[in-house]
From Swiss-Prot:
<feature type="binding site">
    <location>
        <position position="2"/>
    </location>
    <ligand>
        <name>Ni(2+)</name>
    </ligand>
</feature>
<comment type="similarity">
    <text>Belongs to the HypA/HybF family.</text>
</comment>
<feature type="binding site">
    <location>
        <position position="76"/>
    </location>
    <ligand>
        <name>Zn(2+)</name>
    </ligand>
</feature>
<dbReference type="InterPro" id="IPR020538">
    <property type="entry name" value="Hydgase_Ni_incorp_HypA/HybF_CS"/>
</dbReference>
<keyword id="KW-0479">Metal-binding</keyword>
<feature type="binding site">
    <location>
        <position position="92"/>
    </location>
    <ligand>
        <name>Zn(2+)</name>
    </ligand>
</feature>
<dbReference type="GO" id="GO:0016151">
    <property type="term" value="F:nickel cation binding"/>
</dbReference>
<protein>
    <recommendedName>
        <fullName>Hydrogenase maturation factor HypA</fullName>
    </recommendedName>
</protein>
<feature type="binding site">
    <location>
        <position position="73"/>
    </location>
    <ligand>
        <name>Zn(2+)</name>
    </ligand>
</feature>
<keyword id="KW-0862">Zinc</keyword>
<dbReference type="Pfam" id="PF01155">
    <property type="entry name" value="HypA"/>
</dbReference>
<dbReference type="GO" id="GO:0051604">
    <property type="term" value="P:protein maturation"/>
</dbReference>
<keyword id="KW-0533">Nickel</keyword>
<dbReference type="GO" id="GO:0008270">
    <property type="term" value="F:zinc ion binding"/>
</dbReference>
<feature type="binding site">
    <location>
        <position position="89"/>
    </location>
    <ligand>
        <name>Zn(2+)</name>
    </ligand>
</feature>
<dbReference type="GO" id="GO:0036211">
    <property type="term" value="P:protein modification process"/>
</dbReference>
<dbReference type="InterPro" id="IPR000688">
    <property type="entry name" value="HypA/HybF"/>
</dbReference>
Length: 117
């Protein structure tokens, strides 16, 4: 389950940034995880809840946006939705398809609370 190592990395990154900013608690974390990134969002949420225990992120709400996969044909230039890494262009049937969206994985933002909030 690689989601646990990903969850631990997220916790490390957000806690370090929150401390740098003088935060005492993280209330929300917004992630962008493309549907082709190979990460199961529900597993990540489960692992995150375990990884965040006893940290500034222990009560953080994990919001995950999942952009669809998009491919672009290297022959005719058509862009189209893809669900797998290997796709055929629906227009010209070429297999020269480049994935242009759906592999993203990043921490978009987080909400840090300061003392007294």
């Amino acid at each position: 389950m690689h989601e646990m190592s990903i969850a631990l990395s997220i916790v490390d990154a957000v806690v370090a940034k929150a401390r740098q900013e003088g935060g005492v608690r993280i209330s929300a974390i917004d992630l962008l995880i493309g549907k082709l990134a190979g990460i199961e969002p529900e597993s990540l949420k489960f692992c995150f809840s375990a990884a965040a225990r006893e940290t500034l992120a222990a009560e953080a709400l994990l919001n995950i946006e999942e952009p669809e996969g998009v491919g672009e044909c290297g022959e005719c230039g058509m862009s189209f939705p893809v669900n797998f890494y290997y796709a055929e262009c629906p227009r010209c049937r070429s297999l020269r398809v480049k994935i242009v969206s759906g592999e993203e994985f990043l921490i978009q933002s987080m909400t840090i609370e300061e003392e007294g909030e």
